């Protein structure tokens, strides 16, 4: 919806935070001021907002709103019980997995690698979550402007997994990992074998 206005939700967000004892400010970021890396995966139809509030230390949450997202995704209602019970509509895990795989294969970071994409890929496979091909296909076509079969995607994925410098992947993800020894098994071959375990839906 190109006419979507996230700003109309600001008062409700601010009020909910106030009821929890937090004073928040929400500002819209100007995409023209983004660096090359930050803007590498943002579309023209994505608006970015910063939500900031003070706790023991200052905290900022980045919110991205895509007003023209790739379709063919599924959603589900999930119950949240903190800070009080409420229902939230969210994308299903197989569709989130599709978004992660699109990022892993197509994200261009020049000389950098986003190790968190690899960590998440491992998580989805280890927990046996299926990957939604319909949504992944929509993302690929929107991003590249070209058709892509599942087998072609698997070829691109295997190429990325086989040729990426795993030490760079580990270095990027290390600050976010509680037990660094769990990365000892990481190698190109390890990720290629994980890819063989992907369940498609």
Task: Specify the residue positions occupied by each region the protein language model found.
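Structured mid-to-C-terminal alpha-helical surface segments
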Residues: 4-201
């Amino acid at each position: 919806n190109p006419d979507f206005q996230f700003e109309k939700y600001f008062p409700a967000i601010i009020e909910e935070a106030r009821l929890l004892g937090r004073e928040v400010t929400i500002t819209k970021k100007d995409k023209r001021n983004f660096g090359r890396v930050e803007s590498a995966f943002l579309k023209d139809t994505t608006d970015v907002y910063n939500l900031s509030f003070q706790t023991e230390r200052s905290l900022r949450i980045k919110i991205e709103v895509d007003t023209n997202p790739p379709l063919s995704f599924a959603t589900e209602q999930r119950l949240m019980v903190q800070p009080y019970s409420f229902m939230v509509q969210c994308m299903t895990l197989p569709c989130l997995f599709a978004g992660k795989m699109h990022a892993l294969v197509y994200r261009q970071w020049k000389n950098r690698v986003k190790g968190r994409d690899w960590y998440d890929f491992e998580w989805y496979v280890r927990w046996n979550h299926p990957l939604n091909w319909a949504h992944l296909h929509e993302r690929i076509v929107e991003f590249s402007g070209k058709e892509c079969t599942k087998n072609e995607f698997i070829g691109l994925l295997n190429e990325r997994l086989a040729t990426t410098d795993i030490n760079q992947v580990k270095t990027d993800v290390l600050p976010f990992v509680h037990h660094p020894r769990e990365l000892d098994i990481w190698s190109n071959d390890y990720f290629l074998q994980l890819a063989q375990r992907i369940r498609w839906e």
